[in-house]
Regions:
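Glycine/proline-enriched, intrinsically flexible loops and inter-domain linkers
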Residues: 1-241
């Protein structure tokens, strides 16, 4: 199998660049999960795969390049390959997932006593359906990660989680339904435990403009939303809470 990424955009001046080994990992993962999911990973599994990724592109950047947000591009490689091969192997792929890419929320500020605090919170969305089953709920795919537990967030930060719940009807409808996403509500306390103002939030995510697409006539899932006091936030700027 030859995967040719020629024509990919050139590397960018922000952190979305992907190094070759990251690109290869998600290409490998997609193909192996389709054709040999039960074989333990080993070097021989990759021997039938040839990856062509031109140097200097966003999928094979040259030093120096910022790569901290590489998942914003790299996580879509698996989805792209599934879609490309769905014509030939429809029973071995899944539709697009709401947890692609994994959503990272970076909260930071100062506690009441002046001590800095900082926390990275990871969340997933609904997983795409296959031809034989509905998608998993609240899943981080294709990354090997997990949703940050509420107990960790509240013990590590001054924030309060008022709500974490499945988002009804967020999965794409079809013969097989996409998995449900989640709604999570954070509150900055205003009591004796309140941190100093401002509380800053950085969001690294996707799906707020383009919804995860269905396959074989299935409908797309819901788009992501980021609200501050009930009002949509600016997804391209720094918002202080």
């Amino acid at each position: 199998i030859i995967v040719d990424l020629d024509g990919s955009s050139g590397q960018v001046n922000w952190g979305g660049n992907v190094v070759f080994n990251f690109t290869y990992a998600y290409v490998f993962m997609a193909i192996k999960s389709m054709f040999a999911p039960d074989i333990p990973n080993n070097d021989g599994c990759g021997s039938p795969i040839t990856l062509k990724a031109p140097e200097g592109t966003v999928v094979n950047c040259k030093f120096p390049a910022a790569v901290a947000a590489r998942l914003v591009i790299g996580h879509f490689l698996t989805e792209i390959i599934y879609r490309a091969l769905s014509v030939f192997a429809p029973n071995k792929v899944i539709a697009a997932s709401g947890g692609t890419p994994a959503q990272m929320n970076v909260f930071y500020g100062k506690r009441r006593n002046g001590k800095p605090w900082h926390s990275v919170i990871i969340r997933g969305g609904g997983m795409g359906a296959s031809t034989s089953s509905d998608g998993n709920y609240v899943y981080i795919f294709p990354a090997n990660g997990a949703n940050t537990p509420v107990e960790i967030i509240e013990s590590d930060t001054p924030l309060i989680i008022e709500k974490r719940e499945l988002l009804i009807d967020s999965g794409g409808p079809g013969r097989m339904k996409g998995g449900l996403g989640q709604r999570e509500v954070f509150r900055v306390p205003d009591d004796q435990y309140a941190p100093q103002s401002p509380v800053n939030l950085g969001i690294q995510a996707g799906r707020h403009i383009h919804a995860p697409e269905g396959l074989f006539g299935g409908n797309p899932g819901a788009r992501a939303q980021f609200l501050v006091n009930g009002v949509p936030g600016n997804p391209f700027g720094l918002t202080q809470l």
